[in-house]
């Protein structure tokens, strides 16, 4: 229906244009004289140009969008966007309005006018312009189309076209450099060490020793055995294997972006330490990552954190009850939330008894205090053997140092 209305308006304007030309010619014929013909010939170039423009296809234009950088963008970075407009036919145009339609995800920081320019092509076939996006927010931003608009000098003929051109921009969360340290679980009865598995690194031989029952045949050091006439086996370096499970609360919160930033910081710190980790993130698009280590795991987790949204309608305490049991017991559990609730503390206390180490990181906005109820729940958590650490952004660096001292 909308297309039909636009088509009818275009036809009407063309008919009016021919009518004006006919009226100007008729006036000159009947009136005669220099002035009448001067007005007619003065109007003719504009009239003929309007007729030409009415039949000029804007489909002749191609529009490209390029970014000065991509792939390594983080929250808060700036970006330069270059828009290139090209066409095949060099028909003169008085003006051309080009608008790079801003995604809704950038509407708060990027006014629509920022991506719009008025160009004066004349006979040019190629034009460019640039605009900047400052302080990119975390997330997936999809640029999908351009709007082109031109017209004649008298404002009678106007032509518009939407050019589809998709460009995806993924902005990863920023992070704070921090040092991850293995934690200890403290109960009223005393202190118990965290469950750290000791594994032999069979690629690193530290020495030889006499054979012991249970040693594998592949561990036998044949040269040492031949020299001593006693079966000798290789001695390997022992490495700590510390598994961590991060649970991200995705219920809507004013401090959600800070939570994501802190989560990215600890993901980087844990994997950099050489430990293995997994993540649970439940919302409209649930995500559960098995416990692994390495660069690929970090890429997966950062990709998820770049796109994650605060869209969970389920309290984090209930999620813990239903989801965490699928993971092995000997893990350190780090729960990241913005609010301390009774249900969360009770569920965390249950897992603390089974798993040994549970830490609740409560992320608050700058100068936002802990509520009275939250303070009471914090005492309850301590009695159940659960660490609770309230953090504001400047304190992220010392998150694990302070927990260790708690």
Which ranges hold each PLM region?
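An amphipathic, basic-hydrophobic helix/alpha-beta surface used to engage anionic
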Residues: 45-295, 332, 336, 350
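A generic local structural motif
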Residues: 5, 231-233, 318-322
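Acidic, glycine-rich A-domain
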Residues: 268-406
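Extracellular/lumenal glycan-associated context and N-glycosylation machinery
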Residues: 1-65
């Amino acid at each position: 229906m909308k297309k039909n209305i636009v088509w009818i308006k275009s036809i009407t304007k063309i008919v009016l244009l021919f009518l004006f030309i006919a009226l100007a010619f008729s006036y000159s014929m009947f009136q005669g004289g220099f002035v009448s013909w001067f007005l007619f010939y003065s109007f003719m170039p504009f009239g003929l140009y309007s007729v030409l423009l009415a039949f000029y296809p804007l489909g002749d234009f191609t529009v490209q969008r390029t970014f000065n950088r991509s792939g390594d963008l983080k929250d808060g970075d700036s970006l330069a966007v270059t828009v290139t407009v090209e066409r095949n036919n060099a028909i003169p145009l008085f003006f051309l309005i080009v608008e790079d339609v801003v995604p809704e995800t950038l509407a708060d920081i990027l006014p629509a006018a920022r991506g719009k320019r008025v160009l004066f092509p004349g006979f040019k076939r190629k034009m460019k312009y640039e605009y900047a996006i400052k302080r990119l927010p975390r997330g997936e931003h999809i640029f999908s189309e351009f709007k082109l608009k031109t017209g004649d000098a008298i404002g009678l003929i106007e032509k518009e076209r939407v050019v589809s051109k998709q460009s995806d921009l993924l902005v990863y969360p920023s992070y704070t450099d921090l040092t991850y340290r293995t934690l200890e679980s403290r109960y009223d009865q005393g202190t118990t060490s965290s469950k750290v598995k000791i594994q032999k690194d069979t690629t690193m031989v530290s020495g030889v020793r006499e054979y012991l029952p249970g040693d594998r045949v592949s561990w036998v050091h044949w040269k040492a055995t031949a020299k001593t006439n006693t079966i000798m086996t290789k001695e390997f370096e022992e490495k700590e294997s510390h598994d961590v499970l991060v649970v991200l609360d995705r219920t809507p919160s004013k401090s959600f972006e800070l939570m994501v930033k802190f989560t990215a910081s600890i993901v980087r710190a844990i994997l950099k330490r050489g430990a293995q980790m997994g993540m649970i993130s439940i919302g409209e698009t649930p995500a559960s990552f098995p416990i692994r280590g390495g660069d690929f795991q970090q890429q997966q987790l950062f990709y998820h954190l770049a796109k994650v949204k605060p869209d969970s309608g389920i309290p984090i305490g209930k999620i813990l009850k239903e989801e965490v049991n699928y993971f092995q017991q000997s893990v350190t559990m780090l729960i990241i939330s913005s609010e301390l609730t009774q249900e969360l503390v009770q569920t965390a206390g249950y897992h603390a008894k089974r798993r040994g180490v549970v830490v609740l990181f409560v992320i608050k906005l700058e100068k936002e205090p802990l509520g009275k109820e939250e303070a009471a729940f914090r005492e309850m958590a301590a009695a159940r053997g659960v660490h609770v650490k309230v953090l504001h952004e400047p304190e992220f660096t010392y998150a694990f140092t302070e927990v260790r001292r708690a």
